[in-house]
Structure formats: C-alpha cells, structure tokens
Regions:
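Conserved PLP-enzyme active-site core in the AAT-like
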Residues: 1-208, 214-229, 237-245
Length: 247
C-alpha cells in the first residue's frame, strides 16, 4: 500500500550496516524480468542494532548508488542520536555523502507524533504532497503536527535531547556490562544497549515492572534510553538487574 507494490531486498552486513560491495552484488545479481530491478537504497542511521554509519562509510555507499543510478534514502528515525554521537554537522552524513532523501524522526526524540521528510534532491520532491495524501499521510490538522518542530529545532533542542539519551545509554552500558551473565551484543554507540540475558533474569525484570523487548535470538534484549530518561531510573534498573542475577 505505502510503496505501491515495491519489493524489499535484504542485504548482509556486519553490525547492521550495508556495504558498497553488498549493494553492487544486489544490482548485478540478476537482470531478467523475473527479478526485482533495484532502484533505491535505504540505510538506517543509526542502524537497527544501534551502530552508526560514519561519514566515510556513507560517502562510499553514496558513490556506489550513483555509479548504478540508484537513489539513496536515509531512514533517520533516530537521526538526532547519530548526529549527537558522531559530533558532525548534519550535512556531513546526508547530502554531502550523497543522500537524496532523509526521513527525519521526531517521535523518538520528544515529539508526540509525526516525522519530517527532507529532500536534498529537489527533483524527487515534485508532487510529493499528492503522494503523501495517496498513502494516507495527510492529516486534517497538519499544523498541529508541524508546530512542535519549531520548538524542537530552535536553539539546538533536538541535539540536546539526543545527547542526553545517548549519555543515559552510556551510563546503562557501563553499569551492567561488568555483571556476570550479561553479554553485550553490539557496540553501544547511541541510545540503545543490546544485551543477552538469561531467560529467568529477563522474566524477573519484567516481574519487577521493567519493560523492554527481547526479540533478538535467544535471550537478546534491546534496552532503550530516551530524551527524558532519568539517571536515577538507569541506576535503579542496573541495581535490579544485579539483584536478579544474584551478583
């Protein structure tokens, strides 16, 4: 419905990242009519496992997409966290790296609803309003969805929110990583900590009222910190984790 019948092709990559070689392999894999014709590459920044693409990695991907006539879209649901973590200007990991379109996330950073679509390739923006309406994305009170962005982008609020979330995740990582039975699954780079925990420990934490997902393999958990996470809550979770482990 949203993509008008497009097909999603998955590519392998370390730490949740696409690579130029992986993109090229997908383009050249087959060229017959019974195989989807690649047209757009989409990267998630940060990735689904909490790692970030560096400007150098994105420039290499951007060059490969241009080589094969592909568009480059960035899923930036947590884009602010990536910018805060890398300490770079937003342009360095978007249009200067070859990104054509950015989905700039707000709901992960303090806005109640709504994301922003930023076109760097203005040709792609032609009649976008019609396509947004066709996909059911036109709200009758759009001004109420747009207004929070004024406050979010003013005076660097969006980066302060993201930096705080990242800092809370750093604290969480540092408190729980030394605990016996805790295995860190991916490098902590933004506002997420991915850990493997024993099943009884997971259940014990749930029983104490802590909420988190465990959809990553056997015992893999995603622990997220947000713009309003408090340090005392991070320390309380770490203390409960140690108690559940018996450390």
């Amino acid at each position: 419905f949203f993509s008008n019948g497009s097909k999603l092709l998955l590519l392998p990559g370390d730490l949740g990242k696409l690579t130029p070689s992986g993109i090229e392999e997908a383009v050249r894999r087959r060229t017959d009519i019974h195989y989807p014709k690649p047209k757009v590459v989409t990267v998630t920044q940060p990735t689904e496992v909490g790692t970030v693409y560096t400007p150098q990695e994105l420039r290499a991907i951007g060059a490969m997409t241009k080589k094969h006539g592909l568009r480059l879209h960035m899923d930036g649901a947590r884009f602010a966290n990536a910018v805060a973590a890398l300490g770079v200007a937003p342009r360095e990991i978007t249009w200067q790296a070859g990104v054509d379109v950015l989905s700039f996330g707000g709901t992960k950073n303090g806005i109640h609803v709504g994301e922003t679509v930023v076109f760097f390739n203005l040709e792609l923006a032609e009649e976008f309003a019609y396509r947004a309406k066709q996909a059911g994305q036109l709200c009758s009170k759009m001004r109420f969805m747009s207004a929070p962005w004024v406050g979010m982008l003013r005076d660097g609020v969006w980066l302060r929110h993201a930096a705080h979330a990242n800092a809370m995740a750093t604290l969480l990582h540092d408190l729980i990583a030394p605990c016996p039975g805790v295995k860190i699954l991916f490098p902590r780079q933004v506002n997420s900590v991915f850990v493997e925990l024993p099943k009884p420990v997971i259940q014990a934490l749930w029983d104490r009222g802590w909420l988190f997902y465990n959809f990553i393999g056997e015992g893999g958990c995603r622990l997220m910190c947000s713009w309003d996470t408090r340090e005392e809550d991070v320390r309380a979770f770490a203390a409960d984790l140690r108690a559940c482990i018996g450390a």
